[in-house]
Amino acid sequence: MLLSTLSIKRAVLAIALITSFGSLSAQQKKAFISGERLNYQVHYGFIRGGEVVLAVRDAIYEGKTVNNLYLNGKTVGLFSSLYLVDDTYQSFTDIQTNWPLKSIRDIHEDRYKHYSTQTFDHWSRSDSSICNSSKTGRVVVVKGCQDILSSVYYLRSIMVDRKPKPDERFIVDTYFTDEKFSLVIRFKGYEKISTEFGKIDCMKFMPEVLTGRVFKSKDDMSIWFSNDNNFIPIKIKFDIFIGSVSCDLIDYQGLLYPLAFKR
């Protein structure tokens, strides 16, 4: 039960949590298009425990065409029978700025259920944005603040043609679970990651995680992104008290640029 709750849920969130450089300015060059879909498997050692899906779709929000970003993470097999996890996150974002307009969190974890929405107003204030939560009401947040899912795609857009320096640190500003959340992440260099498709050139990043109940060290989480203009998450790894958990890309479709790999 502990494994499924921690590893599957954190795999779902890590793709989003550790991938937003909120203080940077968005570029116009795109990194993704509607129709993109990324599929991941979550493993504890050699045991398959979960699945994660990331997708981009078209939608209409307040009469305007927007991106509908979608993330679902769930347990499978034995883990699902022990402790069911089926979490869905959605974000509706402005196509030009990649700023979130509305976010949805729909959580099903065994007997626990949670559904909440947030809407964002980035334009009525010059120095900040406003988030209206269905649970906590109105909150003033950092200008252009991202939700947990939109941060992934915002980062991907601003990382097009960008080459970070070794150990360069970034501060992330998001609003998640009705709390302002700041995260420090570091670029650690370039590595080749073996996948089902072949070896892929990647950029490695590490967030500074909180130690204690789950992590022994602040460097116990790593994520690898494709070193190209797609900048898609290829692999995530967690070193936690009960072992090592990985989340690996197993299928993709609808990428804006070809994904390069060597067999």
Name what the model sees in each region:
Residues 27-122, 161-263:
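Acidic, serine/threonine-rich low-complexity disordered tracts
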Residues 1-12:
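Bacterial N-terminal signal peptides that target proteins for export
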Residues 11-20:
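Bacterial N-terminal signal peptides
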Residues 22-26:
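Sec/Tat signal peptide C-region and signal peptidase I cleavage site
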